[in-house]
């Protein structure tokens, strides 16, 4: 656990296998995924204040695949980033099946406090956020101006860089939610004074996490 939390960007299963001298890649892989599942704390506080929300893809589109929101060959994600002045506060991420109104509204309700200001792009699925102050932004690219939703777009960029860098592009779509858990855990604790605090927090959450076996993890469906 210390090997994982002491590294700023984490490590891949192959890296953990080498560091610990494990004879089996499967053992390192299982250890990492158990810990990634423990990185989500039940009952964690929702985001609040001003929160930017946007959707993105992971998969074939990253390598020049087909484009367009309704292409289902890609893994769909939604990301929320809390504003902390001009900086980024806490974040949340989730895999989603589609960009329909019901799906996007459920993510917002599960992760953002009612009464918060939710900033989105012009996608119609975001309309009628009745429990929130909705700041819907549509940009005319010909007119230029400041980029829309800068915080959440930066978070999305950092996530993709992390998936391609630390994990060397090996993040399987089947387990992508576990990788999102780790990224959120690390990002939300990036200001911790010491790596020891991350270790303590993860150990605390791992003790209370539901058990996960190799067969449970590998029997998942995408």
Enumerate the language-model features and the residues they cover.
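Residue-level recognition of single "structural anchor" positions
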Residues: 1-222
């Amino acid at each position: 656990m210390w090997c994982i939390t002491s590294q700023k960007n984490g490590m891949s299963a192959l890296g953990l296998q080498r560091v610990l001298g494990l004879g089996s890649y499967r053992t390192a892989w299982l250890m990492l995924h158990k810990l990634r599942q423990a990185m989500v704390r039940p009952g964690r506080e929702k985001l609040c204040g001003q929160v930017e929300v946007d959707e993105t893809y992971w998969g074939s589109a990253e390598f020049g695949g087909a484009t367009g929101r309704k292409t289902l060959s890609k893994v769909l994600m939604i990301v929320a980033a809390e504003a902390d002045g001009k900086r980024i506060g806490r974040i949340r991420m989730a895999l989603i099946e589609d960009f329909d109104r019901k799906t996007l509204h459920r993510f917002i309700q599960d992760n953002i406090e009612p009464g918060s200001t939710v900033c989105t792009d012009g996608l119609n699925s975001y309309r009628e956020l009745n429990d929130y102050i909705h700041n819907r932004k549509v940009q005319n690219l010909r007119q230029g101006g400041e980029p829309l939703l800068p915080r959440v777009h930066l978070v999305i960029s950092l996530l993709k860089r992390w998936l391609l860098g630390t994990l060397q592009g090996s993040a399987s779509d089947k387990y992508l939610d576990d990788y999102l858990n780790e990224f959120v855990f690390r990002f939300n604790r990036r200001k911790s004074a010491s790596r020891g605090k991350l270790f303590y927090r993860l150990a605390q959450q791992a003790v209370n996490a539901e058990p996960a076996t190799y067969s449970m993890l590998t029997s998942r469906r995408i």
